[in-house]
Amino acid sequence: MLRPTLIFPEGAALARGREVVASTDATALTVENLRAAYRRGIFPWPGGVTAPIPWCCPRVRAVLVFDELTPGRTLEKAARKSGWSYSIDRAFPAVIAACAAASRPEQEGTWISPAVLEAYTALHRAGQAHSVEVWQGEDLVGGLYGVDAGGFFGGESMFHRVDNASKLAIWFLATYLRERGQAWMDIQQLTPHLARLGAREVTRAVFLAGLAKELGAGRELFPPRQDPTQ
């Protein structure tokens, strides 16, 4: 199967251009295209299993600045009393599958089609997609996954099976990233769930300038994968 290599706009052309910079089918969801897209602040935004996939750089972008994170007393209490444990990349396939299966009132169905699941699993094997897991004993009760664009991590999707589990996954991740020098993360779209944690929207120009600065820091956020086949 021929898999196209996409050429994405960047710099001023991207900052002043349209929100949808390309439209493809699922064959374009390659590790190489995903790497190139995320480094430019672009992400695929599938609308369904068979629909064309738009590659987007929205004019308004949601971000979570870690110094503005407001967990609130309820979440702080849950963190103290839950007895849950947290991990990174322990169960990426289970996390992305749970995100795909999660029911979301604001959308019909899921954008995480089998092709998307396969593409981001390949990106995980390549060391650039990562997961956070929340465990209640041996049970996976929440988590999220996202993409490391090369020293800057952005979230893609999250899920919870127990109240507060996805929020605590974000809180754990924010602490982890802040300890490694990252000050904020891309969350793409603002939802009420994330707004309650302190997330907000910025313009595309502000986002792209911040992304360039973060990528220029040359950080290594995650250790190399020990087994790239998993």
Regions found by a protein language model. Give the residues of each.
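N-acyltransferase acceptor-side catalytic subdomain
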Residues: 1-230
